[in-house]
Structures are given as structure tokens and as C-alpha cells.
Amino acid sequence: MPLLDSFTVDHTRMNAPAVRVAKHMSTPKGDAITVFDLRFCAPNKDILSERGIHTLEHLFAGFMRDHLNGSDVEIIDISPMGCRTGFYMSLIGEPSERQVADAWLASMEDVLKVVEQSEIPELNEYQCGTYQMHSLEQAQDIARNIIAAGVSVNRNDDLKLSDEILGKL
């Protein structure tokens, strides 16, 4: 099985909260696609709550589009990581890590402005596979933690696992 890009970086050295360009690629017509690792918490040290990350999934996707989409950027998808330490965001375009970090922080401010759980988008059995597994309070706790910590940048060159280490794993 091929080694995926996300497993060639040292998770023990990742800062969080932090944004990282996980991958650059191009469509056959030349459009740039960028995948970002939006690391909310340090791998193997902390984990996002099940209900909190699910509620963030519903809120974050819309808020990030509000703050980042424009003439040169269009978000394709924002999905939670299976390890529950963050989200992957795929988009058309090449915004800077700082632009993404600023949009992320603005989105967290938006999460704090949601007053009631009933305001969570697609919170019903028709549009959500686990519509009862939500917590606005937990999502807002996560947002407060991100705002308080600020968002830094993780660079692939700083996190790259050596061929020697990869060979031993």
C-alpha cells in the first residue's frame, strides 16, 4: 500500500492549533488544489470531543466559506480527521497559511455567536447521519480554546520523517 503524505510527517512534533499545507496538486486543466491540515489539538496528547467535533463540522464548513471563499479560492470540503485532532480542508486555489489561519480564527468567533443548538445547520435526521450527537457547548469550548491559543503554522520541512525512520516503522 502506498504511504500517504499525511503519514510522512512527524506527529510528535506538530504544534497545535496550527495550519499546514498537506498537499498541492493540479487538475488536468491546471487549476490548483490545496489540502490543508487544520490541527486543533496536539496528536496523541489531546482529542476533540465526539459531540463537539461533530457540531463544529456543521458550523465550521459554512463559516470558513464565509471568510475564505473569493475570486481565487473556493472550498471544496472540510472534514474531521478520524483521529479527532483536527480537520482537513480541500480547496481550489492557493491561499497563504496566514489567510487560512485568519479565516479559522474568524470562524471560531462565529461559533461563539451561535446562541442555541437549534441554529446548527442541517441538524435533523434527513440531513445528518447522527443528528442527536451534537453539543453547541462543547463546540464553543473548542472555539474558545483556539482563540485563546491563536493559530500557528506547521511546515512540512520541519516535520518530515527521515527515510531512515520511515524504514523502521
Curated annotation (Swiss-Prot):
Record field: transmembrane: none
UniProt keyword terms in alphabetical order: Autoinducer synthesis, Iron, Lyase, Metal-binding, Quorum sensing
Catalytic activity, as annotated: S-(5-deoxy-D-ribos-5-yl)-L-homocysteine = (S)-4,5-dihydroxypentane-2,3-dione + L-homocysteine
Cofactor entry: Fe cation
MF annotations from Gene Ontology: iron ion binding; S-ribosylhomocysteine lyase activity
Tree of life domain: Bacteria
BP term (GO), one: quorum sensing
Binding site residues for Fe cation: H54, H58, C128
Cofactor binding annotation: Binds 1 Fe cation per subunit.
Family of the protein in this entry: Belongs to the LuxS family.
Function: Involved in the synthesis of autoinducer 2 (AI-2) which is secreted by bacteria and is used to communicate both the cell density and the metabolic potential of the environment. The regulation of gene expression in response to changes in cell density is called quorum sensing. Catalyzes the transformation of S-ribosylhomocysteine (RHC) to homocysteine (HC) and 4,5-dihydroxy-2,3-pentadione (DPD).
Protein's name in the database: S-ribosylhomocysteine lyase
Organism: Shewanella sp. (strain MR-4)
